[in-house]
């Protein structure tokens, strides 16, 4: 599709693809449309996509990621690229890929996930990455995560809640390691403990580092603060990367498939499946 930027044909085409994929896997899909203002007042045509397994089950968990692309590669090492769009293979597609694979497995009779009794809501948040670009003098923190802010204030179901939530952001980059994110520890340390323990128990402790990383304004923040659903962020932390603690391709023209590591994606996906399996067995 190319960059999935709001108000573009690529954005519309990608939304249609995601909706059809989730429906093909037998999930109930709800579309949430809104017109929201970007950091500079640009009207943005926003679409959150909610895909549900066992939609009528009262016990639910939430798994989410953003699907939009950043319009500007404002952290690119070449200043001439700063106003070019980001392909967003990692920062915009990797978390969605993990969710789609879990949804696919839910349609396979031989997989345990097809037999779970609780509900899972996969939410593809839009407009996460239209935040203030670096060339502006002041950053407005409320200009980020617009889709999740809107959903948290207007849930797709009245009175919606979930036992807990897991946000996936940039979960496919080369060299990615996932440290305990600050807001996650503040609002949902028990969920962080559970997920990191599961990762370690199945051999992925080298990816999930049980130490504090950064504190990230991300889609989990409004979910915690507005809906009070304890939600964590699986997000990479590169302590030795000079260009960004999110890694060398963050908000650059290098966020492409060439820089995706399937082993990182597998570690995150396998950990999530094991977390879900443990809920089933509780």
Language-model segment annotations:
Residues 83-190:
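Acidic/histidine-rich catalytic neighborhood of metal-dependent amide-processing enzymes
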Residues 9-29, 94-101, 146-150, 161-163, ...:
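Extracytoplasmic/secreted proteins, especially bacterial periplasmic and envelope-associated proteins
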Residues 2-56:
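A non-catalytic alpha/beta surface segment that caps or lines the substrate-entry region
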Residues 33, 164, 171-282:
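Active-site-adjacent substrate-binding region
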């Amino acid at each position: 599709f190319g960059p999935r930027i709001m108000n573009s044909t690529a954005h519309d085409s990608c939304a249609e693809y995601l909706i059809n994929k989730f429906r093909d896997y037998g999930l109930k899909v709800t579309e949430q449309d809104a017109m929201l203002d970007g950091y500079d007042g640009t009207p943005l045509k926003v679409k959150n996509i909610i895909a549900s397994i066992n939609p009528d089950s009262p016990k639910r968990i939430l798994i989410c990621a953003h699907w939009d692309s950043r319009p500007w590669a404002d952290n690119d090492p070449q200043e001439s690229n700063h106003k070019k769009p980001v392909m967003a293979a990692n920062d915009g597609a990797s978390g969605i890929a993990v969710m789609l694979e879990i949804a696919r497995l839910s349609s396979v009779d031989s997989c345990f996930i097809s037999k779970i009794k609780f509900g899972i809501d996969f939410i593809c948040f839009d407009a996460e990455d239209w935040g203030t670009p670096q060339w502006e003098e002041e950053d407005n923190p409320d200009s980020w995560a617009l889709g999740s802010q809107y959903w948290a204030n207007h849930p797709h179901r009245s009175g919606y809640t979930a036992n807990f939530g897991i946000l996936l952001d940039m979960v496919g980059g080369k060299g990615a390691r996932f440290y305990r994110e600050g807001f996650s520890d503040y609002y949902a340390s028990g969920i962080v403990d559970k997920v990191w323990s599961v990762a370690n128990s199945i051999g992925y402790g080298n990816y999930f580092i049980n130490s504090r990383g950064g504190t990230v304004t991300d889609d989990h923040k409004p979910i915690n603060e507005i809906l009070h659903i304890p939600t964590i962020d699986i997000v990479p932390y590169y302590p030795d990367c000079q260009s960004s603690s999110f890694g060398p391709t963050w908000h650059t023209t290098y966020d492409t498939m060439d820089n995706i590591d399937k082993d990182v994606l597998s570690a995150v996906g396998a950990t999530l499946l094991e977390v879900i399996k443990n809920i089933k067995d509780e």
